[in-house]
Amino acid sequence: MLRSLLLLAPMVGAAVAATEPNSPACPGYRATNVREGHNSLTADLTLAGKPCNTYGTDLKNLKLLVEYQTDERLHVKIYDANEQVYQVPESVVPRVDGKGGSRKKSVLKFNFKANPFSFQVKRGREVLFDTSGSNLVFQDQYLNLRTSLPRDPNLYGLGEHTDPLRLTTTNYTRTLWNRDSYGIPENSNLYGSHPVYYDHRGEDGTHGVFLLNSNGMDIKIDKTKDGKQFLEYNALGGIFDFYFFNGDTPKDASIEYAKVAGLPAMQSYWSFGFHQCRYGYRDAFEVAEVVQNYTQAKIPLETMWTDIDYMDRRRVFTLDPDRFPLEKVRELVSYLHKHDQKYIVMVDPAVSVSDNKGFNDGMEQGVFMKHQNGSLYKGAVWPGVTAYPDWFHPDIQKYWDGQFNDFFSPEKGVDIDGLWIDMNEAANFCTYPCLDPEGYSIENNLPPAAPPVRPNPRPLPGFPDDFQPPAASKRSVAKGSKVGLPGRDLLNPRYQIRNDAGLISSKTINTDLIHAGEGYAEYDTHNLYGTMMSSASRQSMAQRRPAVRPLIITRSTFAGAGTHVGHWLGDNLADWKHYRISIAQMLSFASMFQVPMVGSDICGFGGDTNEELCARWARLGAFYPFFRNHNEITSIPQEFYRWESVAESARKAIEVRYKLLDYVYTAFHRQTQTGEPFLQPMFYMYPEDKNTFSNDMQFFYGDSILVSPVHDVSQTSVEAYFPKDIFYDWNTGDVLRGRGAKVTLSNISVTDIPIHIRGGSIVPIRSESAMTTVELRKKGFELLIAPGQDGTASGTLYLDDGDSLKQSASLELEFKYRKGNLQIKGKFGMHTDLKINAITLLGQTSVPRQVTLSRAGKADSKFDPARQSVTIKTDLSLNESSEIDIN
């Protein structure tokens, strides 16, 4: 949400990193006492000369652990001999079993040089990672390690950022330090930290490198003076905890990463519907009016959201008694539920320091962050002076559960269906050192004044009497091991990362605070704050409704966040630049970071959108996994019904999205089971085609649907790249034979978007769309068969009850087409009354002589010469195998 009030705060320039942190004066380490096993290697590392102490104190004694964890994964860990240096807690990022591999069978090989110590990771004769060009630096507040790279490498990942999908390889610094970052600027640290990169080498394969370290860091990609390419880590602490993943293809590397970071959480069927929100809905009447307007405009609305407007003076776990009184909010939620729609609200981590239940309970249980002298740490956010939950506190889950059980009680509170968590980097408007949060809040009018109380301005048919106008006015500190070394400067480390907010404590929680429990420092765990809130919130939502999958959307993330939550891409702007970059952002999270429930604020959050941009964005946004229109209080309203062309675009977009919803649900489910990305950059599908490596303006929605959006103002055409394959136009059925070149697609109105089905695909779609996903799930299916260049095609369909956390039964179908024969087989664990009502075969030039169904005899078919397709009307059960011959 908008951070415009920050202009009143003192501005601090970004810290300037050292020009050459990896000084040749540092001696490096000497490896001794090397021991090798069938799947591991250990060694002692001893400082090889006089300490350089560039940005801290050199540690004299380190340990090396190498594990061949699987045939495709290698673990290399360099840590202090006494194990006092902070390591990412296993309670936050669980570790995988590392005992299943062997050195002989591993695709990845570890080689090292003893003095000065350096190491290589190789795949066959190919060097993937090589630290021999510089000496290892391991200090109490600074780590440095550099690997050489091939010339002009294809590198991806290292989020969160709004830079191109394929990373710049000259003079590029990617800083990982989570921060509130309105406008999501380029070349800047944003809300999340994902220290994993993918190096794609075309036909030679792909590999991934994950550094499990939550400390602030600069990752530099550049060339030496003599032109040699490198990637360099510069971290403020922690250890070197590397995981190397082999991948014959980019997909394989992503799958391997999922095995370490964790498989994504499966989402409910309804969560893939259309969501509407705005910061600035003044009261419950306006929220209800928006719901009504979508219905009248015949634009399907699945879920209505409310921003912090619903709160009493912006205090979490409260309702504004005048504008969002409990009885009206409960009536609103009841109305939505009766119409098969959902309701979601925002919860921030910061709790108002005032007389309210959230604060009083937290103080009583002692779960807020404290200074080292035991006094309450205070910041300033929307409600004014605030306290911050300590997610490491032993009683924090009890506290959080209690607030959820009370405020979100289905019987007496706000019965939400999902949760939106924001400001959890954690954000703090008051600039460090923030000695007077009370004075800052007064000076900056926190909390902001609420809008005037008003009666409902117009009737809302179908809503309770409370929502109607009055009759007269009717009108139309370290406690154990792996926690952190003592004596560090936790506020001003000598090495300063390139944090665009300035000092590392600027605009966030002070980094010298010590967490309860084990005694971790905020300095080390800052990047974990949002993910720990996500984990606690998921548990709190789950104990409210233990049987169903909780939808939780967060702003701040760390590696592994996808196991708990989805992510929206933050406070973007209503312009074409942010429209375009949303594609690369989405692909990074869904394909590379294993956070597949992801999307941008459609039509833009900050600034005024316009009709053309919003119409285009409605079509593009329908291919985001998380599909939500949202903007802020000072911008013009931008609900899809505000312009007729946008309304038309939205109706068309949602119709396609809903028809494809089960196709996407199937692919998304597969990712939660195997890690195989369901949303993919073009080079994931064509890994040997160099023309796809930098393409972040097109993407695959599942394995079968290629999306090629128009991406600039006043354009009705787009140059789209088509690899050497066969494609079918979604709307016309026209066959396009790709030649590994760009093709100009023309006459694309603002309500359309180019979509093509990749040859070799069988796409199961719903026979028609619907106004809600409950209604949609009652519709039958149609199979679209798009034969590949060899005349074959295949596809899958997964069905379950759409909501249960643990499925008692499911249906998994497999479709295979070859030489006019379609076979449908599967695992029929769940009974359904749904049928396959039609089969459409694309790329045909004439009507078939005969169509035979294995269980129903002959069937009628219809040839469409304009679409070059044959459609067969069927009544095939999904509960048994079937076979169809088309001759």
Swiss-Prot record:
Q: Which residues form the signal peptide?
A: 1-17
Kindly list every residue the record annotates as glycosylated. Answer: 171, 293, 373, 747, 879
* Enzyme class label: hydrolase
Q: Tell me the compartments it is located in.
A: Secreted
E.C. number: 3.2.1.20, 3.2.1.21
GO biological process terms held by the UniProt record: cell wall organization; polysaccharide catabolic process
Q: Keywords of this protein's UniProt record, alphabetized? A: Carbohydrate metabolism, Cell wall biogenesis/degradation, Glycoprotein, Glycosidase, Hydrolase, Polysaccharide degradation, Secreted, Signal
**Annotated Gene Ontology MF terms?**
alpha-1,4-glucosidase activity; beta-glucosidase activity; carbohydrate binding
Question: What reaction does this catalyse?
Answer: Hydrolysis of terminal, non-reducing (1->4)-linked alpha-D-glucose residues with release of alpha-D-glucose; Hydrolysis of terminal, non-reducing beta-D-glucosyl residues with release of beta-D-glucose
Q: Which InterPro entries match?
A: Gal_mutarotase_sf_dom, Glyco_hydro_31_AS, Glyco_hydro_31_C, Glyco_hydro_31_N_dom, Glyco_hydro_31_TIM, Glyco_hydro_b, Glycoside_hydrolase_SF
Which Pfam family, an example, fits this chain? Glyco_hydro_31_2nd
Q: Which family does it belong to?
A: Belongs to the glycosyl hydrolase 31 family.
What does this chain do?
Answer: Glucosidase involved in the degradation of cellulosic biomass. Has both alpha- and beta-glucosidase activity.
Q: What is this protein called?
A: Probable alpha/beta-glucosidase agdC
Native species: Aspergillus clavatus (strain ATCC 1007 / CBS 513.65 / DSM 816 / NCTC 3887 / NRRL 1 / QM 1276 / 107)
